Amino acid sequence: MGGGSWGYKSSSEYPGATPVHFSAWSKEKISVCVPQTVDNGTSNITLPAVYQSSTHANSCGIYKATTSTSDEYFLFENRSSGGYDQGLNMLLLDNSSIYTVGSNYSGGAAIWHVKDILSTCYADNSCMNESPPLVDLEEANNADLDNGSSQGRTTHLFYSANSATFNNSSTPDSKLYDNSSSGISVTSISAAGDNMTLTISK
């Protein structure tokens, strides 16, 4: 899983009270949340901060964009600083530096690329060896999760001051793992905050 600190296990408690939220995929997989499916066409979406999930009890504020490949899709969530996600302050590196972001962390939209073949690889214990990862955070900038250079950076999230577009020709791109177009385009991603807006076309 290319996820780093975005869903870190309980050893990440800081300072003993804020283990960070599970990733959107983890919440979906254990049936804690049922993501809201993005309609075909163009949708203007508001992503609430995941720490406010109690007000969005069923979906937890997570959105899901399916593709033409039945087991491949994208999940969207807002990892704003607050609640248990305050623990990210001491886990994430600030931009491209080697220092944690601390109180300057404001969050952003996390975009997850999922290849849901867990039942297949689990049977022969090969899930950890899958390439590309079955669950991968699309790193907006300073991509270094997959090579182990960091556990997460503020610039891995999407927000207007960092990266506001995710489509077939962006870096990273929204292509499927076979390099064909997913048909997913995300534009007009807002500034980081407890309620982020973006436009998804599919």
Give names to the regions the model predicted.
Residues 1-33:
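Post-HExxH zinc-binding segment in Zn-dependent metallohydrolases
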Residues 35-202:
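Non-catalytic C-terminal accessory/binding modules of secreted extracellular proteins
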